[in-house]
Amino acid sequence: MDRTAKADLVSTLNGVFNANAVVVVAHYKGLTVADMQKLRSQMKQAGATVKVAKNRLASIALDGTDVASIKPLLKGPTLLAYSSDPVAAAKVAVDFAKTNDKLVILGGAMGTTALNPDGVKALASLPSLDELRAKLVGLIQAPATKVAQVVNAPAAKLARVFGAYAKKDEAA
């Protein structure tokens, strides 16, 4: 790779690090080509991307970015998974690592926050941005009658109790 290609790669990676919400770093030693293709396709389906780059070039590209805290993780055969959705890359990486022990999650970063492997796993357990939006829309679209029922339920129960006492007193 000549100097201009390296400079282009550093510039591209710098843009990637600045544009994405989360970056996950993992060791991939021992993964077969088929496994790597499977990981890439799963990432693509989730809206995330996997990139293998020279550690030295990735380290240079990290300078001046919010995710610069992952620099110490760039040792050995590392891959970078990133996505604009704060959960997508972490979720796919953790799920893939569960089924394939050759992918070892080293950590990552979400914005300026550095994540250890447990932090990446915790991030992966959160619902995605789309799932949260769907829940919010569902709550907003709940019919007003349900809200009225919830508000009126205590009064209705109280009225039934008073009615039962009244019938009991009449019978006595």
From Swiss-Prot:
Task: Give the GO molecular function terms.
Answer: large ribosomal subunit rRNA binding; structural constituent of ribosome
Q: What is stated as this protein's family in its record?
A: Belongs to the universal ribosomal protein uL10 family.
Q: Which SUPFAM superfamilies match?
A: Ribosomal protein L10-like
How is this protein named in the record?
Large ribosomal subunit protein uL10
Q: Which UniProt keywords apply?
A: Ribonucleoprotein, Ribosomal protein, RNA-binding, rRNA-binding
Instruction: Write out the GO biological process terms.
Output: translation
The task this protein performs is described as: Forms part of the ribosomal stalk, playing a central role in the interaction of the ribosome with GTP-bound translation factors.
Transmembrane region positions?
none
Give the gene name: rplJ
Ribosomal protein keyword on record: yes
Quaternary structure annotation from Swiss-Prot or TrEMBL:
Part of the ribosomal stalk of the 50S ribosomal subunit. The N-terminus interacts with L11 and the large rRNA to form the base of the stalk. The C-terminus forms an elongated spine to which L12 dimers bind in a sequential fashion forming a multimeric L10(L12)X complex.
The protein's organism comes out as Methylorubrum extorquens (strain PA1) (Methylobacterium extorquens)
Tell me which domain of life the UniProt entry assigns to the organism this sequence originates from.
Bacteria
Q: Which Pfam families match?
A: Ribosomal_L10
- Look up the record and report any one GO term of the cellular component aspect: large ribosomal subunit
Cited Gene3D superfamilies = 3.30.70.1730, 6.10.250.290
